[in-house]
Design a protein with these regions (language model features):
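Short acidic-glycine-tyrosine-enriched beta hairpin
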Residues: 80-99, 204-225
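A short, N-terminal "cap"/entry segment at the start of jelly-roll beta-barrel domains
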Residues: 1-43, 118-168
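Catalytic core of non-heme Fe(II) oxygenases with the double-stranded beta-helix
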Residues: 33-34, 57-63, 153-163, 169-172, ...
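A short hydrophobic beta-strand segment most commonly corresponding to one strand
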Residues: 70, 92, 105-122, 216-217, ...
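Glycine- and acidic-residue-biased ligand/ion/polar-headgroup-sensing regions
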Residues: 64-80, 179, 185-205, 211-212
Length: 249
């Protein structure tokens, strides 16, 4: 068997967040939140979603997360323990880590990313014994670099790596793509790739135009990117479930 065997063809899922119905969900504590699921795992559990916290919402007591939890604040203000997080903040609670009490100081919207098997349990004075959250008050303050694919620097691109899972190599990144970029054609990745458009425009092909608020899931070993291009440039939040690579077809 070679690397090209057992590839899927054109099964990417692209949608706009406005088209996803809001569900009421209880994720942290007892107060419900608004949830627009982006992707669910095979067992029905949430992998990623857009969470809306109304002003005054609170998680109550600190919690322990069973698996890694990441979130990126899109708008609003969130009290996260002693930190106040606004738009463009990013945080990770490692598996088994102590997640401080949260409170929405304003209506707050975030992208939530969870690993498989996520659950939350109350903490009983064990904060100092558990991994602490990783907090980036401004994700854009992370030093950008020019990505290199197949030995070719992508000049005009900016990649900011926000977090890497030390066990799997899975990363979460901000990617700025310059205006007028056109991709090199069909490709696939060995891992799941999820993309949320934060600003601008992009399309993986002509049938899937994306704008701010659009979401794209490229399943692992799925051929996609047939006519990738952007007119005005864009900023994307990307996350994966393993070490990312790009394989040309």
């Amino acid at each position: 068997m070679n690397a090209q065997d057992n590839l899927a063809y054109d099964i990417s899922v692209c949608t706009h967040s406005d088209a996803i119905a809001v569900e009421e969900a209880t994720i942290w504590g007892s107060q419900p939140v608004g949830l627009r699921p982006l992707r669910r795992l095979a067992d029905g559990s949430l992998r990623s979603g857009i969470v809306t916290l109304p002003e005054g919402w609170s998680s109550g007591a600190p919690l322990s997360a069973a698996t890694h939890q990441q979130f990126a604040v899109l708008s609003g203000r969130l009290q996260f323990g002693e930190a106040t997080l606004g738009a463009n903040a990013f945080a990770v609670v490692p598996a088994g880590g102590a997640m401080p009490a949260m409170a929405a100081l304003e209506d707050t919207t975030m992208i939530l990313i969870q690993n498989e098997g996520q659950s939350y349990q109350p903490l009983n004075g064990e904060h100092h014994q558990r991994p602490a959250p990783v907090i980036l008050p401004d994700a854009y303050a992370v030093e950008p670099f020019t990505p290199v694919i197949d030995g070719v620097p992508l000049h005009g691109f900016e990649r900011r790596v926000l977090w890497i899972d030390p066990a799997t190599g899975a990363d979460t990144r901000l990617l700025r793509i310059p205006a007028g970029f056109s991709g090199a054609g069909a490709n696939w990745h060995p891992v799941q790739e999820e993309i949320f458009c934060l600003a601008g425009d992009i399309q993986p092909d002509a049938t899937r135009p994306m704008r701010a608020g659009s979401y794209l899931w490229n399943p692992a070993r799925s051929i996609h990117g047939f006519d990738e291009r952007t007119q005005g440039g864009c900023v994307l939040l990307e996350w994966h479930d393993g070490q990312w690579d790009l394989v040309r077809v």
